[in-house]
């Protein structure tokens, strides 16, 4: 019996052997590896994490957990830092998390792919 993750997504592996939360994300990882091999992007990172810090203080949930954002991919394209998130279902906290990320990390371009 297949086990589904959140939102009925099936975990999948890309050709590079990374485990992803969905088939769509694994397909996008394969595409990005091809772009990197062709020299169109560089410094591809899988699942980078960004922690939200304001005025030198880490944002935390009431239970003490740090608040942050884990994207699917990060890479450099035409000299610009890009962090990319493959979205199937837009979850309810995404608009707020996106706004905080854009405000705290202005040197990154946040790209959403479907």
Feature map (PLM): residue ranges:
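Electrostatic, structured charged patches in enzyme active sites and in nucleic-acid/phosphate-binding
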Residues: 1-114
């Amino acid at each position: 019996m297949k086990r589904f993750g959140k939102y009925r997504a099936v975990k999948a592996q890309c050709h590079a052997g990374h485990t992803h939360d969905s088939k769509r994300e694994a397909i996008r990882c394969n595409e990005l590896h091809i772009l990197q091999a062709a020299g169109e992007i560089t410094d591809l990172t899988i699942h980078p994490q960004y922690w939200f810090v304001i005025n030198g203080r880490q944002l935390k949930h009431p239970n003490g957990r740090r608040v942050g954002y884990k994207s699917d991919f990060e890479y450099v394209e035409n000299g610009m830092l890009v962090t990319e998130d493959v979205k199937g279902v837009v979850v309810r906290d995404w608009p707020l998390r996106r706004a905080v990320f854009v405000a705290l990390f202005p040197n990154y371009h946040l790209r959403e792919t479907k």
